Amino acid sequence: MTIAVCPGSFDPVTNGHIDVITRCCRLFDEVHVVVAVNAMKKPLFTETERVDIIKHALADSGMTNYVVAWTDGLITDYCRKVDSPVIVKGLRQNGDYEAELGMALVNRHLAYVETMFLPANPVLEHISSSVVKDVARHGGDITGMVPDYVVPLLEKALR
C-alpha cells in the first residue's frame, strides 16, 4: 500500500487544495492531508480548526482513502512515522516550482522522501489562501475560491 502525504498550511483550504487532494486520492492507496504548523506564520485558524475544516470540505468529495492530521514537526518526520515515500504538492504558474523544488531537495536529503508535483487545474490556478484572505478582508466575493462551508468561517475570522 502506497501512502502519500499532501502537506500545506491550508489557512484556509481552497478549492485548489481540494482539487489536488482529490486527484491525489485517485493516484494513491491512502493520502495523509497534513496541516503543517509554521511558527513563522500567523494563521487565522488553529491547526485543529483547519483539520476540521478540511474534513468537512472533503466529506462530499466521494473520496474515502484520506486521513487529515496536523504536525508542528518536519514533514519528513511525519512521512517516516506513517511510512510514506512521497510528498505531493500542487504547482501553479506563479513561481511555486522554484520554492517547492528547494523544499523537495531538502526533504529528499533529510529522509529520502520523493516529491511529486501535480500541475494546478487551470480554472483554479489563480487561487491561493493569501489571495482568498485578501479578497475576503476587503469585502470581495470568494464564492468558488473556497468550499462553501469555508465562506462564513472566513468572514467570521476576519471580523
Swiss-Prot record:
Cited InterPro entries: Cyt_trans-like, PPAT, Rossmann-like_a/b/a_fold
| NCBIfam families assigned to the protein according to its UniProt record, in alphabetical order | coaD_prev_kdtB, cyt_tran_rel
Q: What is its main location?
A: cytoplasm
| Quaternary data | Homohexamer.
Gene Ontology MF, one: pantetheine-phosphate adenylyltransferase activity
Where is ATP bound in this sequence?
9-10, 17, 90-92, 100, 124-130
**Binding, substrate:** 9, 41, 75, 89
A single Gene Ontology CC term = cytoplasm
In Swiss-Prot or TrEMBL terms, this protein is called Phosphopantetheine adenylyltransferase
The pathway that the record names for this protein is:
Cofactor biosynthesis; coenzyme A biosynthesis; CoA from (R)-pantothenate: step 4/5
Q: Which family does it belong to?
A: Belongs to the bacterial CoaD family.
Q: Which GO terms describe its biological process?
A: coenzyme A biosynthetic process
Name the HAMAP family for this protein: PPAT_bact
Which EC number(s) does UniProt give?
A: 2.7.7.3
- UniProt site positions, description: Transition state stabilizer: 17
> What subcellular compartments does it reside in?
Cytoplasm
Name the enzyme group at the top EC level: transferase
> What keywords tag this UniProt record?
ATP-binding, Coenzyme A biosynthesis, Cytoplasm, Magnesium, Nucleotide-binding, Nucleotidyltransferase, Transferase
Q: Which gene encodes it?
A: coaD
Q: Which reaction does it catalyse?
A: (R)-4'-phosphopantetheine + ATP + H(+) = 3'-dephospho-CoA + diphosphate
Origin organism is: Bifidobacterium animalis subsp. lactis (strain AD011)
Q: Which cofactor does it need?
A: Mg(2+)
